[in-house]
Amino acid sequence: MALRFPRFSQGLAQDPTTRRIWFGIATAHDFESHDDITEERLYQNIFASHFGQLAIIFLWTSGNLFHVAWQGNFESWVQDPLHVRPIAHAIWDPHFGQPAVEAFTRGGALGPVNIAYSGVYQWWYTIGLRTNEDLYTGALFLLFLSVISLLGGWLHLQPKWKPSVSWFKNAESRLNHHLSGLFGVSSLAWTGHLVHVAIPGSRGEYVRWNNFLDVLPHPQGLGPLFTGQWNLYAQNPDSSSHLFGTSQGAGTAILTLLGGFHPQTQSLWLTDMAHHHLAIAFVFLVAGHMYRTNFGIGHSMKDLLEAHIPPGGRLGRGHKGLYDTINNSLHFQLGLALASLGVITSLVAQHMYSLPAYAFIAQDFTTQAALYTHHQYIAGFIMTGAFAHGAIFFIRDYNPEQNEDNVLARMLDHKEAIISHLSWASLFLGFHTLGLYVHNDVMLAFGTPEKQILIEPIFAQWIQSAHGKTSYGFDVLLSSTSGPAFNAGRSIWLPGWLNAVNENSNSLFLTIGPGDFLVHHAIALGLHTTTLILVKGALDARGSKLMPDKKDFGYSFPCDGPGRGGTCDISAWDAFYLAVFWMLNTIGWVTFYWHWKHITLWQGNVSQFNESSTYLMGWLRDYLWLNSSQLINGYNPFGMNSLSVWAWMFLFGHLVWATGFMFLISWRGYWQELIETLAWAHERTPLANLIRWRDKPVALSIVQARLVGLAHFSVGYIFTYAAFLIASTSGKFG
């Protein structure tokens, strides 16, 4: 018999039903479960796939640059960033009638185009790119890197170039190289680019390879570096009247600590950012020399962890045994990496809008909204993945003997306390927040809005004041002119910072009130409930009260029949599955809040958010319904407009989302019956019965149907909100 898919599992390849295809796809990347896998091949496969991942990333970014250079309007956008709409790429659609062609011909283009809401124009402009030729050069370079990555992946699959397991498990060398190489050297290189290309570019000086060695980034060259007069690099910064991209009002400083924003671009000072990256480079270059390798100096990770024992002996054996547990478990390492990356991605969302790094991006409202939402959703998926792999670690890699009485064992020992406390926090937040919203709703409905329960967020306001916001009247820390912190920073970063914090046109420390207090607690409810489900899923992965012996059932078992009192919904996979719904729900609230707050800020009617956000009907009527009106108006009796594509996507998103429920709320028997009926009809129909198939069609398993349902739910949910967000924002602000 010919080799059938999947080749990595002989058992599955011989399955006579359509299960073979679905289970094959589901386990294709679960290298550990493949037939002839060894630990060495497992590590080598993963290592080689990283090169493929890099190749895809480089190809993708190369494509962005190439399409903007070919079909965009970068050069005309550079001339007037605030009024020219950036073009992502052309639209070729033979079905377009004349009204559509007119509606989508924008940004000075000759035919229908898509507008870019990704911020790439602002990014490329800030880092010194100015012409289409620059973009083409970048695209070709990234294409070259993509090819190099593919060659690297191929090379490391050849017998001679396959690294050994001991190389993969050399934690100290990896830490040193990743800290000093990935973070340190790349930050230093980026500082170099900012100082040599971007900062001169912001001052009207065009630095390229042909004049790179002739243009001094600073009038005094490297003199101050070698003589220790580093402060000279901070003298004569750009003035507040500086016009970005020109020499008008420009200074000569390259490394500053001005604080606040460039008045014209509303973004952080480039010289501040160069300084920041230099500092990061220094810290990580030092950190990358801290661990003991061939030279016998520095820390040993194992020694560090073994020494971490809580004093007094009351809290067990601390970190003993952790080194081998983590170093031998790819799932533990992946869980840690995903948790870190998820947090970082969410922080990127928060900081990209509040402290914009790219010139003029703060005035491009749709881009700000799109980037915030994009990064928050990605953070949510990555964080749930962290807990999923944490659970797989407990099932496949956790060894109780190796971890006796250390922090991992103690987490498992008192998991009931952890889960019950999280449960209590979630219940408390949920009932109290909903209670306040519903009370306020009823008061509004009965025409007595003055009877609402409105709570001022005084602690959060106090924290904002401590950072220098004066409008609340708290005389504390940086908002107190007599404090030592205030006086210490007055000569350097503080004037710029205080000016930015107290200027109401940006997103730094937005003024908050009762509506913010309520939605903050609604979000806290979502975060705690999502965490509860994920933590419980991981801590109960090996066994729980009802089913103490889950280890051999694996990560994603569906149900084990009624024998144990019914074991549906208690696998670690089920916890992940439920948590993703809560994660989407939570990020929905987060993005609703962010978007509504900002729309009213940008339109200059903040009172609408303040007054309507304290009760549920306000959210439904004044945010969702009011802002979807443009969307539903994409097609109207007068033809179509440039929002029609979002109107269509809004409908399509709802369709995909609703399709999810078809898989989520149905029984497997119903599907099997349906499939048998369809197969029977097919075989008895002339012409149709000429087409045969080898695999007997069977319904999806419980776990598969849930996965398909979850995928449709997630994609539809995000598609729908993306269309709403982009259309409602671009419809208002162009």
Swiss-Prot record:
Q: Please indicate if the UniProt record lists Iron as a keyword.
A: yes
Q: Which family does it belong to?
A: Belongs to the PsaA/PsaB family.
* Residue spans crossing the bilayer: 46-69, 135-158, 175-199, 273-291, 330-353, 369-395, 417-439, 517-535, 575-596, 643-665, 707-727
User: Which residues does the annotation say bind chlorophyll a B1?
Assistant: 654
Some GO term, biological process aspect, for this entry: which one? photosynthesis
Q: Which UniProt keywords apply?
A: 4Fe-4S, Chlorophyll, Chloroplast, Chromophore, Electron transport, Iron, Iron-sulfur, Magnesium, Membrane, Metal-binding, Oxidoreductase, Photosynthesis, Photosystem I, Plastid, Thylakoid, Transmembrane, Transmembrane helix, Transport
The record, for InterPro entries, names: PSI_PsaA/B, PSI_PsaA/B_CS, PSI_PsaA/B_sf, PSI_PsaB
Annotated residues for binding of [4Fe-4S] cluster: 559, 568
Cofactor binding note of this UniProt entry:
P700 is a chlorophyll a/chlorophyll a' dimer, A0 is one or more chlorophyll a, A1 is one or both phylloquinones and FX is a shared 4Fe-4S iron-sulfur center.
Q: How does the record say this protein sits in the membrane? A: Multi-pass membrane protein
Summarizing the function annotation, the protein's role is: PsaA and PsaB bind P700, the primary electron donor of photosystem I (PSI), as well as the electron acceptors A0, A1 and FX. PSI is a plastocyanin-ferredoxin oxidoreductase, converting photonic excitation into a charge separation, which transfers an electron from the donor P700 chlorophyll pair to the spectroscopically characterized acceptors A0, A1, FX, FA and FB in turn. Oxidized P700 is reduced on the lumenal side of the thylakoid membrane by plastocyanin.
EC code? 1.97.1.12
Annotated GO MF terms: 4 iron, 4 sulfur cluster binding; chlorophyll binding; electron transfer activity; magnesium ion binding; oxidoreductase activity
Report the protein name in the record: Photosystem I P700 chlorophyll a apoprotein A2
Q: Sorted alphabetically, which HAMAP family does this protein's record hold?
A: PSI_PsaB
Q: Where in the cell is it found?
A: Plastid, Chloroplast thylakoid membrane
EC top class, in one word?
oxidoreductase
Q: What's an example GO cellular component term for this entry?
A: photosystem I
List positions binding chlorophyll a B3.
662, 670
User: Catalyses which reaction?
Assistant: reduced [plastocyanin] + hnu + oxidized [2Fe-2S]-[ferredoxin] = oxidized [plastocyanin] + reduced [2Fe-2S]-[ferredoxin]
Quaternary structure and partners: The PsaA/B heterodimer binds the P700 chlorophyll special pair and subsequent electron acceptors. PSI consists of a core antenna complex that captures photons, and an electron transfer chain that converts photonic excitation into a charge separation. The eukaryotic PSI reaction center is composed of at least 11 subunits.
Q: What is its main location?
A: plastid
Q: Does the keyword Transferase apply?
A: no
Binding sites annotated in the UniProt record for phylloquinone: 671
Q: Which PROSITE patterns match?
A: PHOTOSYSTEM_I_PSAAB
